[in-house]
Amino acid sequence: MSLIIQSLPHWSRIPPRPPQLSQFQNSSRPKPLIQAGQVQHNALQIARRSANYHPSIWDPQYIESLKSPYGDECFGTRLEKLKFEAKRLLEATIEPLSWLELVDSIQRLGVAYHFEDEIKEGLDGVYGVGAHAGDDLYTAALQFRLLRQHGYGVTPDIFNKFLEKERTFKACTSLDAKGLLSLYEASHTMIHGEEVLEDAKEFSVKHLNYLMGNLQNNLREQVQHALEMPLHWRMPRLEAKHYIDVNGRSDERNMVLLELARLDFNFVQSKHQEELKEVSRWWRDLGLAKKLGFSRDRLVENYLWAVGIAPEPKFSNCRKGLTKLISILTVIDDIYDVYGSLDELELFTEAVKRWDIEALETLPEYMKICYLALFNFVHEVSYDTLKDYGWNILPFIREEWERLCMSYLVEAEWFGNGNKPALDEYLRNGWISVGGPVAMVHAYFLQGRPIRKDSINFLDHGSELIYWSSVATRLNDDLGTSKAEMKRGDVPKAVECYMIQTGESYEDAREHIQGLVRDCWKKMNEECLKCCLPKSYVETVLNMVRTAQCIYQHGDGIGTSTGVTQDRVISLICEPVPSQWP
């Protein structure tokens, strides 16, 4: 075990959740929803903190004006024809390397969900061949990465042919830029204990940087893009937009795939625009942003989160549900982090534990509308799941919200008492307070698949995949927000906890936390090879981390959502890709 991983919490099990859902199957309907307007308000004056969050940068009229022509039937007909042609191309490509490159392009272009069966059948055949991946580094690394990403138990022994007796990479590979880039991308699918892949990452980074100045423009851009963030860590929808642009400028572009990717991107974007309009109306009608002006009004940015986590068209309900969840969660987070007194926060936490509408009368005025919004949302999700699948998930997701609010209260008590927790103690609480577990449990039920008992049991007893992805999300969040929160005097987050604990500088502390993120990815990669959850859901969990790395890559992309976050919203949701290239 590395020194880095020892800084993470040491338990291997997640704290227990409520009884298995089978005990609640086909039970009575949730309580009817209550209208927020029924609540009577009583003002309570208390000195309040403020984070001075800027208001929403998105004009509701602009959101309502979004209208893409790509949802029209004529484009749907063309899309189906292109899918058929691409499927024929997959079937007709016999040469192994050409087929692997085709699959890699299909994935990067964001259209692999159309060809899941064909890709699986082909990879089954590749895996059956064993370690015979060809004699060049590029092919071997590409094959290894694709198999790992799809959950095949391939080992790094495939790289032995490129090693000297001393287990170092042969000198001749140091000049193969294309092979080094492929090796670099493959190394990020590593799990703990795979030293050859650790060496591969260091070796490829060193020599790619050395070769950079002598590379042709197209390859140099690819290397720079990869070294900024590896493919395995990138938000898929954002990578698809980038890769469509790169292919549009390439002399080697495949016109069938390129047109398919362009049209599919714009078609899916048209669906995303309609969803954004729907949840924007819901948010305005809910009234939380207007009533609770101290909180972050980030509906559009929250929808970007949802697009990053579950981008495919079939997950429309999941995206809308996650946007609602994140929006309500953000307000509650700001109540605990900034606005509420400790006495008020204890009342709110107790009300969530009771989960009784009568608890409303124990709350101060401003908390009532927030409690009702949460109450109604959870009952809506529970009712829809019971109606469609016969499972009463209310006790299950209630428990997740209770754990979340309890973790918020712990952080509020740390702040109120001036406590500065050690990094281990902070992360034991922080993996919950980041909202990962509550979001991923909701996502499972919102994705519209028949609910499997074995998956329920897996979630119920604690998912290591959800745990490590939540730790990684927390660490990425803290890397992006630490400067602003330290300046504001908030409770110490991961970077500051490590600085206080060790006396290290801010830069060294950030480097350590980045190392923890890398270790989390190794654990997630390992869990992906052995967990029993549906593959599409596993990707959803990984996408939470990928989206967090996108949102917090250049700072607090939610607290301050101008700049990079605004540009990414426009790029992914508002502006279609060009219909033709020079």
UniProtKB/Swiss-Prot annotation:
Pfam families: Terpene_synth, Terpene_synth_C. This is Trans-ocimene synthase, chloroplastic. (2E)-geranyl diphosphate binds at R296, D333, D337, R474, D477. It is an enzyme of class 4 (lyase). Residues 1-35 form a transit peptide. Gene3D superfamilies: Farnesyl Diphosphate Synthase, Terpene synthase, N-terminal domain. Pathway: Secondary metabolite biosynthesis; terpenoid biosynthesis. Its EC number is 4.2.3.106. PANTHER family: OS04G0344100 PROTEIN-RELATED, TERPENE SYNTHASE 9-RELATED. Mg(2+) 1 binds at D333, D337. Keywords: Chloroplast, Lyase, Magnesium, Metal-binding, Plastid, Transit peptide. Mg(2+) 2 binds at D333, D337. Transmembrane segments: none annotated. The lineage of its organism: Eukaryota, Viridiplantae, Streptophyta, Embryophyta, Tracheophyta. One of its GO terms (biological process) is monoterpene biosynthetic process. It catalyses: (2E)-geranyl diphosphate = (E)-beta-ocimene + diphosphate. The gene is TPS1. It comes from the Eukaryota. SUPFAM superfamilies: Terpenoid cyclases/Protein prenyltransferases (SSF48239), Terpenoid synthases (SSF48576).
